[in-house]
A protein has these predicted regions:
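A short alpha-helix capping/helix-coil boundary motif
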Residues: 15-19, 42-44, 60-62, 79-80
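Detector for intrinsically disordered, low-structure N-terminal pre-sequences
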Residues: 18, 22, 149-150
Length: 157
């Protein structure tokens, strides 16, 4: 049996050498914003876990967890353009969060993207430079988006 102090020592040792949480991106390769965010993550020195959410949608529980971590209303995660949003009548303010989640589970294209998860937080990264707020190393230098816009972020502490 280990003593209390041995547990404290082991716990402290593990904290010192803790492996950082990997960066995860819920990605749609057909989306320019999502491609820009992925490129910014890589330029920061991270190789993220890439979840192509249209091929591998999050579970309902995971989606609820992401929404809670972003501290946004469910409705704010809905994508309108290029989706069945209008046909499904999702602009109806009477629809509950559960009904909106049902729609996103049935039609993952309704989930706005990209969502990025890091040890510093979870964000819907629109515009793409929003990702810099949660990257472990946001000092990526000058970055040129696909549309030619140059982003010159400063390191944030």
């Amino acid at each position: 049996r280990r003593s209390f102090f041995q547990y404290i020592y082991i716990s402290s040792f593990m904290d010192i050498f803790e492996v950082p949480m990997p960066v995860t991106i819920y990605h749609n390769p057909a989306c320019g914003t999502s491609r820009n965010v992925l490129a910014m993550i890589r330029q920061s020195g991270e190789e993220p876990e890439i979840i192509e959410y249209l091929k591998t949608p999050p579970t309902r529980e995971k989606l609820q967890e992401l929404i809670a971590a972003m501290a946004i209303p469910v409705r704010d995660l809905l994508r309108r353009k290029g989706t069945p949003y209008d046909e499904l009548g999702l602009d109806d303010p009477a629809l509950s969060d559960a009904e909106l989640l049902d729609a996103m589970m049935a039609h993952p294209i309704l989930i706005n993207r990209p969502i990025v998860v890091t040890e510093k937080g979870v964000k819907l990264c629109r515009p793409s430079e929003t990702v810099l707020e949660i990257l472990p190393n946001p000092a990526i230098g000058a970055f040129t988006k696909e549309d030619g816009e140059v982003v010159s972020p400063q390191a944030k502490k």
